[in-house]
C-alpha cells in the first residue's frame, strides 16, 4: 500500500503545481449527495481515486477498535466485524456494492440507528488525511479519551473531503446483538407521535422506527420498529 499512497501524494502535488481542480472519488455510490457534478480528466480536472487504498490496518476486538483505509468496502469491513460478533454502532447506508469507509465518514450519513446509537462522528477516534499540499496529517488515535486538543478527526465526518482526502479512519465498534426483531403495530399518526415521544425517554433498544399510512380514510397506519 505504500506505493498506492505515494501515487496519491504525487497526484495531489501534480494537481497543485498545475493549478487544476482535484476531485476525490470513491465507490461512487453517493454522487447524488452534496454539491456534486460529473467530472472527467478530459475536462481538465484531476480525479483522486481512493478505492485502491483499501484494507483493514488493525483490528482489536477486545478493545472494540478498528482502523481501516478509506477505500475499504463497507461490506468487507462489516463482514470482518461480524466474524467477531461486533458491528458499527451507526448504520451507514450503502447505496450500492461500491460503498467505502471513506465515503461513509466523508458523507456523515449515520442511517436510521442514529437516534438511538449516535452519529458517525461520535465513533471516530482518529484519522489520517492527505492535504492539498500532498502532506499526510494524523489526528486522534485509537482510544476514546483524547485530550490532545480539538478533535479534528471527528470534524471529518460530513466534511466531504474539504479538509483533505481521508486515508485511514479509526472507529469504535460495539457488540452485535444476538437477536434482532422487527415489529409492526397498528396505530394512527397521532398515536405514533405520542409513542415515539414516550419511547425516546426510555432506555429501549430501538434502532429505528417509522409510521406508515395505510391509505384508509380514518387515517390509520402502522408503526414499524
Report the location of each language-model feature.
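N-terminal glycine-rich flavin-associated loop
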Residues: 1-24, 50-97, 105, 109-142, ...
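Glycine-rich beta-strand-to-loop/alpha-helix junction loops that act as flexible
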Residues: 24-30
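Residue-level "edge-of-site" marker
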Residues: 28, 93-94, 212
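Short secondary-structure capping/turn micro-motifs that flank functional sites
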Residues: 31-32, 97-98, 215
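Glycine-rich loop at the start of a catalytic domain that most often binds anionic cofactors/ligands
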Residues: 32-54, 80-82
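Short acidic, glycine/serine/threonine-rich loops at helix termini
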Residues: 33-38, 110, 140-142, 168
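C-terminal substrate-binding/cap subdomain adjacent to the FAD-binding core in PCMH-type
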Residues: 106, 125-225
Amino acid at each position: 500500500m505504500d506505493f498506492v499512497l505515494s501515487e496519491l501524494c504525487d497526484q495531489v502535488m501534480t494537481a497543485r503545481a498545475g493549478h487544476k481542480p482535484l476531485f476525490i472519488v470513491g465507490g461512487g455510490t453517493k454522487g447524488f449527495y452534496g454539491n456534486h457534478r460529473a467530472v472527467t480528466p478530459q475536462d481538465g480536472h484531476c480525479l483522486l481515486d481512493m478505492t485502491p487504498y483499501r484494507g483493514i490496518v488493525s483490528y482489536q476486538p477486545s478493545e472494540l477498535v478498528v482502523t481501516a483505509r478509506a477505500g475499504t468496502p463497507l461490506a468487507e469491513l462489516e463482514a470482518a466485524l461480524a466474524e467477531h460478533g461486533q458491528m458499527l454502532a451507526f448504520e451507514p447506508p450503502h447505496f450500492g456494492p461500491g460503498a467505502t469507509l471513506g465515503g461513509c465518514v466523508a458523507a456523515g450519513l449515520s442511517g436510521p440507528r442514529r437516534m438511538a446509537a449516535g452519529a458517525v462522528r461520535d465513533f471516530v477516534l482518529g484519522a489520517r488525511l492527505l492535504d492539498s499540499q500532498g502532506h499526510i496529517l494524523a489526528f486522534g488515535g485509537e482510544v476514546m479519551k483524547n485530550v490532545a486538543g480539538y478533535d479534528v478527526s471527528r470534524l471529518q465526518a460530513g466534511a466531504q473531503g474539504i479538509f483533505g482526502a481521508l486515508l485511514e479512519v479509526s472507529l469504535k465498534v460495539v457488540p452485535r446483538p444476538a437477536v434482532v426483531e422487527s415489529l409492526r403495530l397498528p396505530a394512527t399518526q397521532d398515536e405514533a407521535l405520542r409513542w415515539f415521544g414516550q419511547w425516546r425517554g426510555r432506555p429501549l433498544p430501538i434502532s429505528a422506527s417509522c409510521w406508515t399510512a395505510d391509505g384508509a380514510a380514518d387515517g390509520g397506519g402502522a408503526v414499524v420498529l
